Amino acid sequence: MNEDETSILNKKMEKIEVEMAEFERLGAEREKEAVERIVQEENQNPEVPSNDDASTDIKSRKEGNMKVTAEEIGLETENFDELPVSNGFGVSRRETHYGNNRTYYKNSQGYRRKPKRDDYNNNRKNFYPPIQNSTYFINATGGIDSMPYFGLNNAPGNIYPFSMYKPLEADPQYLSVPSSMPSRREAGMAYGYQNYKRGGYTPNTQYFEEPLNNTSFPNSQGKEGKNSGYRKSSRILDIRVKFGNSSMKAINFQPKKKIVHVVHNPRLHQNKVLRVSIPGSQPALVTPKHKMNVPPMGMYPLPFSPLPSAAPPIPFSPNVSSHPHMAFLPATVPTHSAPPGFVPYDFPITNDKMYPSPSFQEEFPSTSKSPSATPGSSNAPVVDMHPSADSATYPTSIYPSNVRARDDSQQAYISANMTTGEMPSMTNVPAGNAPAAPGTMYTTPLPTANSPIAYQSYSVMPTYWSFPQNYDSTVPAVYPYMPPPFSGSDMNVMSNPAADTLRSYSPASQVSTPPFGFVYYYDPNQYYVPVSNESANATSQPLSNLDTGGSAPYDHI
């Protein structure tokens, strides 16, 4: 490139720079002018005229044969809908008339219209109450007595479930319970026309009507419309319902039609077929209940802190009674020893027949054979342990520590078979872990400061959540998928660590309680599995969706 070409290029660049500077200067001037014009327009009428002043001004200008605009006529007339007003583009524009203190809108044709009531966007009082007005937490003032009874499969401590008690007043978005953080309502045709061609959610409801054969009605003999001999109380509708928005339908009975009513909702996964018996020709209100009123996983009401990051979210399990057992493990041994089966806690009464819990506190007379009843004896509860070979004399407890280790000679049982009120002799305790001779009775050592007692003589409800070995939220924890009452690796009051020889265990650490007052032990064996040697971390890998490391097989939970 010679000098001439270089000079030409430099001149072109200088010219471009000058033009760009001029362009920027003009743009800044225009922006400044626009701002000044807006400020000037806003400052033209600093004082709002009253009705009388404006009307007088219009009358004087009428007498002077001056031009009067339609907007000014609007100050003294009420027939706003007849006044065509346009802003020049036919676009809806908002005006505020100070005379009557009302706001009017202009539609696309330029006519004024009255504003719509914003019932479905702002005024939601008839859908669900404000969250801050709800006091149905389990740890509210009054404790359990202030908590309503929710039924068998409903997690206690939730916010008032409108869909259960007042289904017609409940927001259809919240089938079980409203969360403490209200999400955006689904836009549907019921909330106005704002979703027109905007991809708003509209449930696809399809009706399939299949004519029935007349021979299916006894004694009908082909008579049209006459169902003689057919009992009105046994008309059957096949109604396939997907729970969700618009799943509550009033279905008019049609005598000769088989109505298959399908409601598709992409937000839900349950699909249940209901056979509804129609007692007559009256409409049937089909209100399917949610399978279980399950709170959203990981989203608990605000007063509770989130779960520890090491443990997975805990779903509501039907293995646990519908009432929370306030059976927090005592920090110290109780001052009295209780007979077998006695639970020193006031448990609420539950109607759960499948998983019953102690519902009353028994009173024992002073002639009890418990160690504390004998003067001079220690108040420390004592549990004798005997080998399972003598199970005929000492039957096993209801919940052995490990159901697969039932024949293990090291198995410890919970029943306290105290035959006298005195402390048993400590001389026949076998050395080490050797089993005792059949028929002999030996006890745990007396508690010391460094060695607290291992087994209390009262039974405590399970203090862990019985998950499968590898927790998977997609597997329901109900029969036949129920885990055994005590997993082989748990470490609670009723487990014998020496008896579990099937696999090694790590000591369970008590973590903070999840919502609704349950105490559980976090056992890493229930949530961790070994990782293959090819992995960078060859020790263990958490199976928790709260794990920030991203355990691949369980990211979908």
Curated annotation (Swiss-Prot):
- Major subcellular site: cytoplasm
A GO cellular component annotation here is: nucleus
**Entry's localization field:** Cytoplasm; Nucleus
Q: Which residue ranges have biased composition labelled Polar residues?
A: 101-110, 358-380, 390-400, 536-548
Region of interest called Disordered, as start-end residue ranges on this chain: 39-62, 101-127, 356-402, 536-557
Keywords, A to Z, come to:
Coiled coil, Cytoplasm, Nucleus
Coiled-coil zones: 2-45
Under what name is this protein listed? Uncharacterized protein C622.15c
Query: What organism does this protein naturally occur in?
Result: Schizosaccharomyces pombe (strain 972 / ATCC 24843) (Fission yeast)
